[in-house]
Swiss-Prot record:
Keywords: Chaperone, Cytoplasm, DNA replication, Metal-binding, Repeat, Stress response, Zinc, Zinc-finger
Database matches in InterPro entries: DnaJ (IPR012724), DnaJ_C (IPR002939), DnaJ_domain (IPR001623), DnaJ_domain_CS (IPR018253), HSP40/DnaJ_pept-bd (IPR008971), HSP_DnaJ_Cys-rich_dom (IPR001305), HSP_DnaJ_Cys-rich_dom_sf (IPR036410), J_dom_sf (IPR036869)
Assembly description: Homodimer.
Biased amino acid composition, Basic and acidic residues: 371-380
Binding sites annotated in the UniProt record for Zn(2+) 1: 153, 156, 206, 209
Domain free text: The J domain is necessary and sufficient to stimulate DnaK ATPase activity. Zinc center 1 plays an important role in the autonomous, DnaK-independent chaperone activity of DnaJ. Zinc center 2 is essential for interaction with DnaK and for DnaJ activity.
Gene label: dnaJ
Superkingdom to which the source organism belongs: Bacteria
SMART domains reported for this sequence: DnaJ
Keyword Zinc-finger attributed: yes
Cofactor note: Binds 2 Zn(2+) ions per monomer.
Stated name of the protein: Chaperone protein DnaJ
Organism name: Delftia acidovorans (strain DSM 14801 / SPH-1)
Region listing for Disordered, in residue ranges: 359-380
């Protein structure tokens, strides 16, 4: 008989998350528990449970899942996980140990199951906040960071025991690192409270490392900051988190990017914005001005009568984001500056200009006419 699709067995989509897969399996495991299926239904429940267990074992392992997604049942060992017909209801104890172990302080980092020896744990992930400039974010850079790292203790050579002594096998778990607790039909596997999952007890701990077998030191890492990275993005450095337990893999280091405020530019996605001061003479008469960009200077033609707040767009002068195929734009916002500390002669010239403008009426001011109309309406 051909096997059913593993995703169909668990009732989840092919893009289901690990949590969704675990929840679906837990639901089926509870449904087909022997305490809930007696008599004629027991055999069918056993088969359903085995089927769900096999699907869960394949889809909860990232490597097996990838092989299954690519090649189907041919990509995985057809005998793995089912244990043949001789397993019977023994599979319930193991599976429920795995499921309920997660509920009783066994965490998502645990690897291995009942009867598999000492518990193996993946190390915790670490985070590191890194501050860079806008220019560095735009162009990318190679950087070095120093992070705390656990290295083997030179005094005890990683054993955790005082020189001249050795660790002893834990008598509570017999070196397994875990203990089984039975609750009715349930067999719950928990970390040994005496040795904390190591399977060993150290009567005389090393004084240099406190019995941990490792000491914390500073480690220098090379980090490549990709061009276009944005504030809040994270870079993963695999295997540079905390070390695992009992030979488990190390966690990862996540470097979170923080971009410093810039004196000139403000970033909005791939676009940049900046305020450009312009004299009121240039705004009135027009002219060419220089504006800064991240790649140098650029020229803008200011037309006659440019008003404060006018926006000029320089295409392609923004930032090319890490997921973008082309750079954003630079938006220059005009700020018309009013002169200060005028001489008496300059004041006289401005007054003459003012009188001349008054004689011309509202035609010299784009908003003057509408403003006059609004005033009349307000006071009428």
């Amino acid at each position: 008989m051909s096997k059913r699709d593993f995703y169909e067995v668990l009732g989840v989509a092919k893009n289901a998350s690990d949590d969704d897969i675990k929840k679906a399996y837990r639901k089926l495991a509870m449904k087909y528990h022997p305490d809930r299926n007696q008599g004629d239904a027991a055999r069918e429940a056993e088969e359903k449970f085995k089927e769900a267990k096999e699907a869960y074992e394949m889809l909860s392992d990232s490597n097996k899942r990838a092989a299954y997604d690519q090649y189907g049942h041919a990509g995985v060992d057809p005998n793995r996980g089912m244990g043949g017909g001789a397993e019977g209801f023994g599979g319930f104890a193991e599976a429920f140990g795995d499921i309920f172990g997660d509920m009783f302080n066994q965490g998502g980092g645990r690897r291995g199951g009942a009867g598999g020896g000492r518990q193996v744990y993946r190390g915790n992930d670490l985070s590191y906040a890194m501050e860079i400039t806008l220019e560095e974010a735009a162009h990318g850079k190679d950087a070095q960071i120093r992070i705390p790292s656990w290295d083997g203790c030179d005094t005890c050579h990683g054993s955790g025991a005082k020189p001249g002594t050795s660790a002893k096998t834990c008598t509570t778990c017999n070196g397994m690192g875990s203990v089984q607790m039975r609750q009715g039909f349930f067999s719950v596997q928990q970390t040994c409270p005496h040795c904390r999952g190591t399977g060993k007890i150290i009567p005389e701990p090393c004084t240099s490392c406190g019995g941990q077998g490792k000491v914390k030191r500073q480690k220098t890492l090379e980090v490549k900051i990709p061009a276009g990275i944005d504030d809040g993005m994270r870079i993963r450095s695999s295997g540079n988190g905390e070390p695992g337990t009992n030979g488990g893999p190390a966690g990862d280091l996540y470097i979170e990017i923080r971009i410093k405020d810039h004196d000139i530019f403000e970033r909005d996605g791939d676009d940049l914005h900046c305020n450009v001061p312009v004299s009121f003479i240039t705004a009135a008469l027009g002219g060419e001005i220089e504006v800064p960009t991240l790649s140098g200077k650029a020229a803008i033609d200011i037309p006659e009568g440019t008003q404060a707040g006018k926006q000029f767009r320089l295409r392609g002068k923004g930032i090319k984001g890490v997921r973008s195929s082309y750079p954003g734009d630079l938006y220059c916002h005009i700020v018309v500056e009013t002169p200060v500390k005028l001489t008496e002669y300059q004041r006289k010239l401005l007054r003459e200009l003012e009188e001349s403008l008054k004689k011309g009426g509202a035609k010299h001011s784009p908003s003057g006419e509408s403003w006059t109309d609004r005033l009349k309406s307000f006071f009428s």
